[in-house]
């Protein structure tokens, strides 16, 4: 049986994740006999220069996959973001479906759309992203894609997402 490890939100750049932390992570993964590592987003604010080299380094030790988080999307086009979404990997009969996901504010219905947008624009990192749709539309689009994909798959399914 394959042992899959899951983690997210390393924020390699802002947490100053260096050689010691990387070595420690590799040792823990080996000690726990992890066969495959999946990182569910927010590796860094720089996918090309920080996150992808980090993934390649980990892949020297064990198979590693990832999906984007909101921080990983900085500077990416919608097409680039979409290219990382809805990856399917097979582990025996079990499939791992990974995608970034998004939010539509439905967990806080007492706030108006305007209040949510004001909070986002004042505090959230996501205000720096150049997305083509508003948040509820992004969520709806993502859910449609997920429903279609799930309908085409059989057997046990693990879903990994950032949000």
Task: State where each predicted segment sits.
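Active-site-proximal loop/helix segment associated with metal-binding centers of metalloenzymes
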Residues: 97-154, 163
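N-terminal active-site segment of His-dependent metallophosphoesterases
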Residues: 1-61, 73-75
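Active-site neighborhood of phospho(di)ester-bond hydrolases with catalytic His/Asp-centered motifs
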Residues: 6-8, 37-42, 64-70, 83-86, ...
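Beta-strand-turn-beta hairpins that frame and shape the catalytic cleft
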Residues: 1-5, 88-98, 103
